[in-house]
Amino acid sequence: MLKILIPTLMLFPTIWFSPAKWLWTTSIAQSLVIALASLSWLKWSSETGWSSSNLYLATDPLSTPLLVLTCWLLPLMVLASQNHISPEPLNRQRTYISLLVSLQMFLILAFGATEIIMFYIMFEATLLPTLIIITRWGNQTERLNAGTYFLFYTLAGSLPLLVALLLLQNDSGTLSMFTLQYTQPMHLLTWGNKLWWAACLLAFLVKMPVYGVHLWLPKAHVEAPIAGSMILAAVLLKLGGYGMMRMMVMLDPLTKELAYPFIVLALWGIIMTGSICLRQTDLKSLIAYSSVGHMGLVAGGILIQTPWGFTGAIILMIAHGLASSALFCLANTSYERTHSRTMLLARGMQMILPLMTTWWFVASLANLALPPLPNLMGELMIITSMFNWSHWTLLLTGLGTLITASYSLYLFLMTQRGPLPSHIIALEPTHTREHLLITLHLIPIILLILKPELMWGWCF
């Protein structure tokens, strides 16, 4: 664990003491080396699955893929931000990259924590850098409104969790993930325990987010700069799913009784957000709503508590993280050239930037879960396990898949095909930086299907 944490910490002096000319190059190079070093986590070899450097930080097959995804994303965020942050004053550029690095530190500590209270503290700590990135570097003035939504939704959702954790500490005397799975704190079906169950899961349902408490997400995504959108879509939403999986072990007998409304809400959300996507005019908003739909499927897979559901949820979280981050990067390349997020004002791009269209096509297909990609594997495992749980869910998940395919193709056709508007005839060509950025997103998706056991948790 420290072989990643210490180099990440050493990124701060790199950022603040590098000369202006080399700031971006050194930051990207060092963070890419850290990302490559983090791949060594995937080779875990212990009987329990846990491999711990000490009592407080450990990795297991559930957290490892998410840790590697976090490390992989930092160089990509810095790479994506270079164009629109580099004209700013030097100290502001340094502050921006430092915020991204601190976010990575908090996320590594959150996914690596073995004490639930430490996980909670890091879960909350990720709020601060994200909030600063949205409210300081967002594009429009609505960013303050978006930041407020983001802050209050997340805080209001996670305060009951803090109370629940303190009660649990008082009751069982420990909050360590190693021991809590052997103590069953909630074997009585009393009203107090039911409220406690809801408090434990509410924070994660808001963070995922499940349909109904999702209003902060489109606002935050639309107003955030590119790095904010990428980290939010790729890793911060996954904190919710990861937290739910960790807490599910303890909440056992109650979940079977109380999870029904949340499963229905999650599945209904897939159809509702898909329908909302079909009538979006704003590019980033469409991608943000599609994230809510995919996370609804993940929530359903986790709440039915079957090994296949858990496995499908982990795979879909990783695959969706890379695919939606790639889509946000592509939306940003379009926005930097046309200065508009409205799809009608930036269409027919295939005429001018044909190679970008190829990237758009691959990313859209990854989003709609085309066969060779892990997105399909995750979705199929969740849909199959839900079908075994109740046959009626097939109506909702099947319709959701159909709508997902529809809006993904609608997104591709609206941005890339059709007549070219007269005001965007002369656009600057694509840079190697942008091609590298999208390649580093899409290559892991394509390669992961060759060795999916890296990310399917304990079920092997």
UniProtKB/Swiss-Prot annotation:
It comes from Salmo salar (Atlantic salmon). It is a multi-pass membrane protein. PANTHER family: NADH-UBIQUINONE OXIDOREDUCTASE CHAIN 4. The keyword Ligase does not apply. InterPro entries: NADH4_N, NADH_Q_OxRdtase_chainM/4, NADH_UbQ_OxRdtase, ND/Mrp_TM. Core subunit of the mitochondrial membrane respiratory chain NADH dehydrogenase (Complex I) that is believed to belong to the minimal assembly required for catalysis. Complex I functions in the transfer of electrons from NADH to the respiratory chain. The immediate electron acceptor for the enzyme is believed to be ubiquinone. This is NADH-ubiquinone oxidoreductase chain 4. The keyword Transmembrane applies. GO terms for cellular component: mitochondrial membrane. One of its GO terms (molecular function) is NADH dehydrogenase (ubiquinone) activity. Belongs to the complex I subunit 4 family. The chain crosses the membrane at residues 20-42, 61-81, 94-113, 117-139, 148-168, 195-215, 225-245, 258-278, 285-304, 308-330, 351-371, 394-414, 436-456. It catalyses: a ubiquinone + NADH + 5 H(+)(in) = a ubiquinol + NAD(+) + 4 H(+)(out). It is an enzyme of class 7 (translocase). Keywords: Electron transport, Membrane, Mitochondrion, NAD, Respiratory chain, Translocase, Transmembrane, Transmembrane helix, Transport, Ubiquinone. It comes from the Eukaryota. The lineage of its organism: Eukaryota, Metazoa, Chordata, Craniata, Vertebrata. Its EC number is 7.1.1.2. GO terms for biological process: ATP synthesis coupled electron transport; electron transport coupled proton transport.
